[in-house]
Amino acid sequence: MRLPMNTSLAMLKPSGIRRINALAAQRPGCIALALGEPDFPTPDVISAEVIAALDRGDTHYPPNNGRPALREALSAYMGDAGLTFSADEVILTDGATEALSATFMAMLNPGDEVIIPTPAFGLYESIVVANHAKAVFLDTEPAQFQIDEDALRACVTPATKAIVICTPNNPTGCILNAASLDAVARVAEQAGIYVVCDDVYNRLVYVDGYERFAQRHPELREQTVVIESFSKPWAMTGWRLGWLAAATPVIAEIAKAHQYLVSSAVSFEMDAATRALTVDPTPMLEVYRARRKRVLAALSAMDLDVVEPAGAFYTFPSIKQFGLTSEDFCIKAIKEANVALVPGNCFGTEGHIRLSYCVSDQDLDEGLNRLSTFISTL
């Protein structure tokens, strides 16, 4: 008789986002406003570095944490943004997903708790549970997707090990304001917990005054882990490249998890990664900015309430007025209007849908038209 597999993994469900996209892919002509992936190709100057690396046979094992020159470049790049980490405090990872996995693998013991402000990317909960820890959810909807300090304190227990924040946020596109960041800092300092910053959208910001947690609260660097990615700012989702930074005692433990999870990132992508850091993502940002404006105007015309996103490439409008669950709404939209959106329950917040505007202008406009027509029938 076969023995059971890992019971923690048995509790996990496949990605709801991927499930919706798979359903959409089965329908010819369906427009997917669901997956958070830039619709641009990787800039040629970045891709050229991989071609050159392969031509010269750069296909051997690199250092586990990434080549020193690249880690120096990442350190300088973060320094330009006001985040101070030495090259030895940086690890190149197989995307932000592996960075999160290595971080929580190194950080969590069975029974530990991680606070996850919702709505949130479902990956956080999955990684926490896979490491035999517990996800504790903090509902931010009542505070317009900001952090209420009293509500946060109510989530803290003797078992709390960390809080994970994502700003700009997936799925709302909202940015945590100074009061929210300060609330997290006060609670983290008093409780001694770690702050894991998923900063993968930090180059996709449409407003002035954006601050990152590690930038605003350098006094907590010993408790802070910063995670970044090449995927979103440089349209490199398929490359699976990211990095993380943390103080020396913390990065030393994460490095062990990283080594035994993947050994290293891909050798022949490292020069391309260094080159990417010099490429200005502003042209893509401006396209997203224009699309965001059109999306907000369209949602307003549909009488859908939405907290205006200040970053990333998502909106998270409310659909509570229709009396449908977010899952039912999205399945109905696929079947009746041939447009795919992501249910809010995938992010721990019912009564909303996530609409991504990282698609071609033509598809975006047609998708919005289909959504408008669909809503008029409800």
Segment roles from a protein language model:
Residues G57-H60, A73-A81:
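Glycine-rich loop-to-alpha-helix module at the N-terminal edge of alpha/beta enzyme cores
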Residues N65-G66:
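Short beta-strand to alpha-helix junction loop
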Residues H60-Y61, Y201:
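Intrinsically disordered, tyrosine-centered linear signaling motifs in cytosolic regions
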Residues R2-M5, A10-M11, L23-Q26, I31, ...:
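PLP-dependent class I/II
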Residues L70-L74, G95:
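Conserved AMP-binding/adenylate-forming core of the ANL superfamily
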